[in-house]
Amino acid sequence: MAASAAAASAAAASAASGSPGPGEGSAGGEKRSTAPSAAASASASAAASSPAGGGAEALELLEHCGVCRERLRPEREPRLLPCLHSACSACLGPAAPAAANSSGDGGAAGDGTVVDCPVCKQQCFSKDIVENYFMRDSGSKAATDAQDANQCCTSCEDNAPATSYCVECSEPLCETCVEAHQRVKYTKDHTVRSTGPAKSRDGERTVYCNVHKHEPLVLFCESCDTLTCRDCQLNAHKDHQYQFLEDAVRNQRKLLASLVKRLGDKHATLQKSTKEVRSSIRQVSDVQKRVQVDVKMAILQIMKELNKRGRVLVNDAQKVTEGQQERLERQHWTMTKIQKHQEHILRFASWALESDNNTALLLSKKLIYFQLHRALKMIVDPVEPHGEMKFQWDLNAWTKSAEAFGKIVAERPGTNSTGPAPMAPPRAPGPLSKQGSGSSQPMEVQEGYGFGSGDDPYSSAEPHVSGVKRSRSGEGEVSGLMRKVPRVSLERLDLDLTADSQPPVFKVFPGSTTEDYNLIVIERGAAAAATGQPGTAPAGTPGAPPLAGMAIVKEEETEAAIGAPPTATEGPETKPVLMALAEGPGAEGPRLASPSGSTSSGLEVVAPEGTSAPGGGPGTLDDSATICRVCQKPGDLVMCNQCEFCFHLDCHLPALQDVPGEEWSCSLCHVLPDLKEEDGSLSLDGADSTGVVAKLSPANQRKCERVLLALFCHEPCRPLHQLATDSTFSLDQPGGTLDLTLIRARLQEKLSPPYSSPQEFAQDVGRMFKQFNKLTEDKADVQSIIGLQRFFETRMNEAFGDTKFSAVLVEPPPMSLPGAGLSSQELSGGPGDGP
């Protein structure tokens, strides 16, 4: 029995000293020498996989109390919670347990009091709170030296002060024991320091057994999963499986490093998914804002009685994307919370692996394992792709009636509707018939929100409903709200509706899946009458209302456009498309024309094939409805309510400061006031009653602008817009080039002196005609000059009454203008600088 105990003691001493046991030899030494490098590699791998966003603050949190933010020191009795956050014992309050038994052989286990973590608010039992051994050696060096000075020899029972320290045995020795240590054959080769702290080879402070006060914890009992001393292993842990400290540390570090690497890879995926969700939320918000602007541009064109009904429909349409946005918000919130938790676990585990405190690592491995396994079991749903949403509208889509304005119909392709069939005659889907297949789910009528039909003869063609519902595959009842659509402000609508016109209808065509975006269609209530379906009257027949266009709010995938014309998308990224669809004869629509090019809001304006407009042939649009009448360029245009000419704000004379109202008329159509009523004492030559020459009176200014605008819009005058070939004008020289751009600049007082009389204005125009006549030798051009002079005289006579301007249409002597030398772009306010 004694021999067996001696053998066990020798084996324990061998483990503590680090010398190779029987049969190990140099190979065992090599194995131990590679263990630190393997642990360092695993630690480096964990550090590489740890999040970079932690920074110094996250690492500082590991060494500071989560409550008082003070640095954790041994005298503050740091405690480690199961969530791997640390706090002072005093900050945790009475629920904090006393220091647990290091060897696991005794000590109070604590009660079942529930404690809230001061950092992450997770609840845990007080018995699960352990001492933070990583912070055990964080005290000042002075305190450490003072403690080492009081260390007694552990090899004898004399309690003599220790003067030396054996590195292999990790024991403080007195002078007598040092001599005995060097005489024994087994220990004579040990490294003995004359003085120094009681630390092991790795530089960490030795932890002593609570039962055997002088015995260090040098063994790891696998059966009890705890550190033991040699005496405890021979007594309380007899016949248990155990490992030497170095072997246990090496094995546990490998396991922890593997778990940290796995969690690091999963955390990287979570970070990517979180960024994608955040990006998706921003994109959904941006799409909503963009579509909201597009819808406002269309809503401003329709009639004022649509205001009341339109608000209800827009509020219903907002539910189209609401579900997806709320789901993404919840998913992002959950992912962010899990991400922060995993970041802390990774930081703590990496910090523990990088630490050289093997004892603390083994004592805390349960908590670390638990959190790593728990984090690995968390399942994060993948980010679902979202589609592209567009807004398309037809300029001539709006109707005259706001009573029973329409409805929202939800259709899901590939699903069969189990609800009652809508009480309406057969309708053709129109231009959007290929945008989705499947049945239409009628809306459920809700009390207080029905669309009353009144006396409208065509109102019975559509069910009057407002509830936004949709059916799911395999379900017989309607459930779920449509996802959110952009909000549209209708306060600026000022429209005139008549009771004998058919209201438009709102329809929602959902995507192919539950997550796809939906399609909202605004069409005339009687549009089915012109589609040529059996049972309906074709367009143009008696009793059939005219076919109207459609305004479409469109949400679709980027590369799978639903029903968009070939010109509506270019490249992989689609733009919002403003479609100008044709309307039947007699239909009236809004007057804001933006037919081609790009508008200020980024809308791409296209004209689908086969469409026509008043004044144009089949498949084409009239030039007056596509480009500016003055500069012949597209862009943001305003349309005259009478002549239907389109102008840029700067091209019109006088220049427009803001977008005019619906009933706006250009200067060519505007009725000018009587000269005598406005001018008073001013005569046609611009002189007042005192004889002092002044600039044009307001009435004469308006008349000259009207005549000049007529010249700009007159097609034969197109070559006269800018005759100057140089970059600057040179009117101060005889024969200087003169064109409509310069005349416009002087009329708008961009050149001085401005015109003081209509006669002076007429002289400049006549001089321009003569200069152009000198530049050409073609007889046709000469005849056109004569025709232009007659056109100008006619316009002047119409504006100024019976006054004859033939006498002043002669070339006056050259005049030097202070504005000479200005570039044409500085002088031109319209033809050359349209939007």
UniProtKB/Swiss-Prot annotation:
Its main location: nucleus. A motif (PxVxL motif) lies at residues 481-494. The keyword Repressor applies. Residues 695-799 form the Bromo domain. There is a cross-link at residues 377, 469, 750, 779 (Glycyl lysine isopeptide (Lys-Gly) (interchain with G-Cter in SUMO1)). Zn(2+) 2 binds at residues 209, 212, 232, 237. The modification Phosphothreonine is found at residues 498, 541. PROSITE patterns: BROMODOMAIN_2 (PS50014), ZF_BBOX (PS50119), ZF_PHD_1 (PS01359), ZF_PHD_2 (PS50016), ZF_RING_2 (PS50089). Residues 65-376 are annotated as: RBCC domain. The modification Phosphotyrosine is found at residue 755. InterPro entries: Bbox_C, Bromodomain, Bromodomain-like_sf, KAP1, TIF1b_Bbox1_Znf, TIF1b_Bbox2_Znf, TIF1beta_RING-HC, Zinc_finger_PHD-type_CS. One of its GO terms (molecular function) is ubiquitin protein ligase activity. Residues 246-376 are annotated as: Leucine zipper alpha helical coiled-coil region. Changing residue 779 to R: Abolishes both sumoylation and repression. Relieves the repressor activity on Dox-induced GADD45A transcription and 2-fold increase in phosphorylation at Ser-824. Nuclear corepressor for KRAB domain-containing zinc finger proteins (KRAB-ZFPs). Mediates gene silencing by recruiting CHD3, a subunit of the nucleosome remodeling and deacetylation (NuRD) complex, and SETDB1 (which specifically methylates histone H3 at 'Lys-9' (H3K9me)) to the promoter regions of KRAB target genes. Enhances transcriptional repression by coordinating the increase in H3K9me, the decrease in histone H3 'Lys-9 and 'Lys-14' acetylation (H3K9ac and H3K14ac, respectively) and the disposition of HP1 proteins to silence gene expression. (Microbial infection) Plays a critical role in the shutdown of lytic gene expression during the early stage of herpes virus 8 primary infection. This inhibition is mediated through interaction with herpes virus 8 protein LANA1. This is Transcription intermediary factor 1-beta. The gene is TRIM28.
